[in-house]
Curated annotation (Swiss-Prot):
Organism listed in the record: Stenotrophomonas maltophilia (strain K279a)
Name of the protein in question: Phosphoglycerate kinase
PANTHER family tied to this protein: PHOSPHOGLYCERATE KINASE, PHOSPHOGLYCERATE KINASE 1, CHLOROPLASTIC-RELATED
Gene Ontology, cellular component aspect: cytosol
Enzyme Commission identifier(s): 2.7.2.3
Alphabetical UniProt keywords: ATP-binding, Cytoplasm, Glycolysis, Kinase, Nucleotide-binding, Transferase
Quaternary structure (record): Monomer.
HAMAP family on file: Phosphoglyc_kinase
Length: 391
């Protein structure tokens, strides 16, 4: 990729517009998780230290275009940024037609999704954004899969368009995991439905050495192998698809190891009685809610031998203590592995937090949908636009 990096630019005296992802959860005016705000600080500080006139914008929630609403205002974010940076961070409400900002100053521009034309990647709005700055910096990987005015259109028209440190760290980590991985490459893909991860599975099966499936996805593969899954969540209409994915893997020498034992219950309840069963001993009224200890040990061995691990999704109902052991075993294996590891997806990050392994994972992707689309082999609009500008 030939993307211009913000870290390679001299921003002194330049007007710099930075698109961040500051879409944080807010309840009753209070920010309940500020991870995205703290993640943005090094980018903002770097621009300020170089003497740039810094404008920052982000989306928050899903406001109606053309209508200001307090519930979707970035006001709490501006206040928290000012506390973290130790300087006043004014919030500018009407900013599309011009912004007053001096070198060494930082202003936060109100929720860009309130601007008419943002969602449709309107060209006129994109040009107005571009006219605000000398340099546009795209640093919001989490929205890189959306072709909108602040994530795509402005890149086409800004005098200079660059990738910010957060975005580039994400792209560098994903490239290391998928484009030139240390072998063997092992992926863990889990979730409730094969249908939501079909493209991901189809793309990864052409790259990986081992593909571990978990959750409802694993149940569909177990059923496709001819085993009874009882009352478990699975997709009977995708059994042939699962068989094809297994055949495609085998054809290129890759492996999709199936569970040899599972943890079952009679009801989907936190206090349900957990019972370990061989995969061929599942009863008609059983629910499969986790992988069994023997399977977890086998998978942990594969992780230990891997050169690269990509993790998307917990392998059991880890929110229920009795059905969290499989996910915990894999999390601990990843934490102690020498492999380059990348973890992403909301439930995966919750598992990383629950088992306190964040420091042992090489890279944690906060990209959500963008992370998934990249794993699916799709071109992200923001990345493609930055690449075109850097060529």
């Amino acid at each position: 990729m030939s993307i211009v990096r913000m870290t390679d630019l001299d921003l002194s005296g330049k007007r710099v517009l930075i698109r961040q992802d500051l879409n944080v959860p807010i309840e009753n005016g209070r920010i309940t998780s500020e991870q995205r705000i703290t993640a943005s600080l090094p980018t903002l500080k770097r621009a300020l230290e170089q003497g740039a006139a810094v404008m920052v914008t982000s989306h928050l929630g899903r406001p109606k275009e053309g209508v200001w609403s307090e519930a979707d205002s970035l006001a709490p974010v501006a206040q928290r940024l000012s506390e973290l940076l130790g300087r006043e961070v004014p919030l500018v409400r009407d900013w599309v037609d011009g912004v007053e900002v001096q070198p060494g100053q930082l202003v936060l521009l109100e929720n860009c999704r309130m601007n008419v034309g943002e969602g449709k990647d309107d060209e006129a709005l994109s040009k107005k954004y571009a006219a605000l700055c000398d340099v546009f910096v795209m640093d919001a990987f989490g929205t890189a899969h959306r072709a909108q005015a602040s994530t795509h259109g402005v890149i086409r028209f800004a005098p200079v368009a660059a990738g910010g440190p957060l975005l580039m760290a994400e792209l560098d980590a994903l490239a290391q995991a998928l484009d030139a991985p240390a072998k063997p490459l092992l992926a863990i893909v889990a979730g409730s439905k094969v249908s939501t991860k079909l493209e991901l599975l189809a793309n990864l099966v052409g790259k990986v050495d081992q593909l571990i499936v978990g959750g409802g996805i694993a149940n569909t593969f177990i059923a496709a192998a001819g085993y009874n899954v009882g009352k478990s969540l699975y997709e009977p209409d995708l059994l042939d698809t699962a068989k094809k994915i297994v055949a495609d893997a085998k054809a290129r020498g890759a492996d999709i190891p199936l569970p040899v034992d599972v943890v079952t219950a009679k009801q989907f309840m936190p206090d349900a009685v957990a019972e370990v069963k061989a995969v061929d001993a599942v009863a008609e009224d059983d629910l499969i809610l986790d992988i069994g200890p023997q399977t977890a040990a086998q998978y942990a061995q594969l992780i230990d031998k891997a050169g690269t691990v990509v993790w998307n999704g917990p392998v059991g109902v880890f929110e229920f203590e009795a059905f969290s052991k499989g996910t915990e075993a894999l999390a601990r294996a990843i934490a102690s592995s020498r492999a380059f590891s990348i973890a992403g997806g909301g439930d995966t990050l919750a598992a990383v937090d629950k088992f306190d392994i964040a420091q042992q994972v090489s890279y944690i992707s906060t990209g959500g949908g963008a992370f998934l689309e990249f794993l699916e082999g799709k071109t992200l609009p923001a990345v493609a636009a930055l690449d075109a500008r850097g060529a």
